[in-house]
UniProtKB/Swiss-Prot annotation:
Main location: membrane
Family the entry assigns: Belongs to the ATPase gamma chain family.
HAMAP family: ATP_synth_gamma_bact (MF_00815)
Pfam families in UniProt: ATP-synt
Protein name as it appears in the record: ATP synthase gamma chain
Source organism: Microcystis aeruginosa (strain NIES-843 / IAM M-2473)
Keywords noted in UniProt: ATP synthesis, CF(1), Hydrogen ion transport, Ion transport, Membrane, Thylakoid, Transport
Organism ancestry: Bacteria, Bacillati, Cyanobacteriota, Cyanophyceae, Oscillatoriophycideae
Listed GO CC annotations: plasma membrane-derived thylakoid membrane; proton-transporting ATP synthase complex
Length: 315
C-alpha cells in the first residue's frame, strides 16, 4: 500500500515548485514586452542606416576607394560570434544556438578553414570551454536588456581581430526574434560589412493580455517599409568617402546591438513558454498524485473496516 505521508509530501513539493515556475513565468512575461518593444524600435534605424550605406556604396561603386571594413580577402580564418544567455530554464533556446554553431564549425572544418570563437553568454562559454574550443574572447554577465555600450565593447574586439587580419571574416550566430512562439537561430556575416537590409515581413507587434488567469497574445502583422533610393543629383556637404568611413563602425555596432536585443527577447519568450509548460505539467502531476492519495486513503479506510468486522465476527 502506498505511503500516505510520502504522497502528501510529494504533493506539497510539487505545489512549491509550481509557485516558483509561476513566479518565473510572470517575471519573464513582464520583461518580454519591454524587450520586444526595443527590438522593433531598433529595426527602423538599422534598416535606414543600411539604406544610407547602400546608396553611398552605389555612389562610390566606380571610385578607387579603400575602406578596410569593406575589404574582401581570401578567407583562411573565420571568427564566429555566438550569442546565448547566461542562465538556463528557457527551453531549447541555448541548445539550439550552440547546435547551430557546431554545425557551422563542422562546415568550416570540412572546407579547410580555421575558426575562432567569440562567445557572448555564460552558457556558450561554459559549453565550448569544456570542449577545448579555440575561444578568442568571451563576454558574460551581460544585461538582460542589452545596451549600446555592451555592443560597442564586443564590436571593438571584432574590429581588432578583423583589422589586424587575425581573421578574414566575422560571422554572427544568434536567435532571430519573430514572435513569442517563433525564434530561429540564424547566421549573419558581420565583417566585411554588407548592407542587405533587414527582413521584417514576418514580424508581429503583440501585446500580452490575461484571460481567466492565463496569458493570451493579441497579434498584429508588421508591414515592411519600401527601400528609399537617393536621387543621383544629391549633393553631400562632406566627401561621401568620409561619411561612409564614419558610418561603418556605427553600422557594425548597431547590427550587434540589434542581435543582442533579439537574442534577449527570444530568451525571455522561451523562458516564459518553458515556465508556462512547467506550471501546466505541475498542475497535472498534482492532480494525478491527489487521485493516488485519495485511492490509497480509501483503501486504508476499507482495510480498517474489514479488520474491525473480522474482529467482531471472531468474538
Amino acid at each position: 500500500m502506498p505511503n500516505l505521508k510520502a504522497i502528501r509530501d510529494q504533493i506539497q513539493s510539487v505545489k512549491n515548485t509550481k509557485k516558483i515556475t509561476e513566479a518565473m513565468r510572470l517575471v519573464a512575461a513582464a520583461k518580454v514586452r519591454r524587450a520586444q518593444e526595443q527590438v522593433l524600435c531598433t529595426r527602423p534605424f538599422a534598416d535606414a542606416l543600411a539604406q544610407v550605406l547602400y546608396n553611398l556604396q552605389g555612389r562610390l561603386a566606380f571610385s578607387d576607394v579603400n575602406l578596410p571594413l569593406l575589404a574582401q580577402r581570401e578567407v583562411k580564418t573565420v571568427a564566429l560570434l555566438v550569442v546565448t544567455g547566461d542562465r538556463g530554464l528557457c527551453g531549447g533556446y541555448n541548445t539550439n544556438v550552440i547546435r547551430r554553431a557546431e554545425q557551422r564549425m563542422n562546415e568550416l572544418k570540412e572546407q579547410g578553414i580555421n575558426y575562432q570563437l567569440v562567445v557572448a553568454g555564460r552558457k556558450a562559454a561554459q559549453y565550448f570551454e569544456r570542449r577545448n574550443a579555440p575561444i578568442a574572447a568571451k563576454f558574460i554577465n551581460l544585461e538582460q536588456i542589452p545596451t549600446a555600450d555592451e555592443a560597442g565593447t564586443i564590436g571593438d574586439e571584432l574590429l581588432s581581430l578583423f583589422l589586424s587580419e587575425t581573421v578574414d571574416r566575422v560571422e554572427l550566430i544568434y536567435t532571430r526574434f519573430i514572435s513569442l512562439i517563433s525564434a530561429t537561430p540564424v547566421i549573419q556575416t558581420l565583417l566585411p560589412l554588407t548592407t542587405q537590409g533587414l527582413a521584417v515581413q514576418d514580424d508581429e507587434i503583440f501585446r500580452l493580455v490575461t484571460k481567466e488567469g492565463k496569458f493570451k497574445v493579441q497579434r498584429e502583422k508588421m508591414a515592411s517599409q519600401p527601400a528609399q533610393v537617393f536621387p543621383q543629383d544629391m549633393i553631400f556637404e562632406q566627401n561621401p568617402v568620409q561619411i561612409l568611413d564614419s558610418l561603418l563602425p556605427l553600422y557594425l555596432n548597431n547590427q550587434l546591438l540589434r542581435a543582442l536585443q533579439e537574442s534577449a527577447a527570444s530568451e525571455l519568450a522561451a523562458r516564459m513558454t518553458a515556465m508556462s509548460n512547467a506550471s501546466e505539467n505541475a498542475s497535472e502531476l498534482i492532480g494525478t498524485l491527489s487521485r493516488t492519495y485519495n485511492k490509497a486513503r480509501q483503501a486504508a479506510i476499507t482495510q480498517e473496516l474489514l479488520e474491525v468486522v473480522a474482529g467482531a465476527n471472531a468474538l
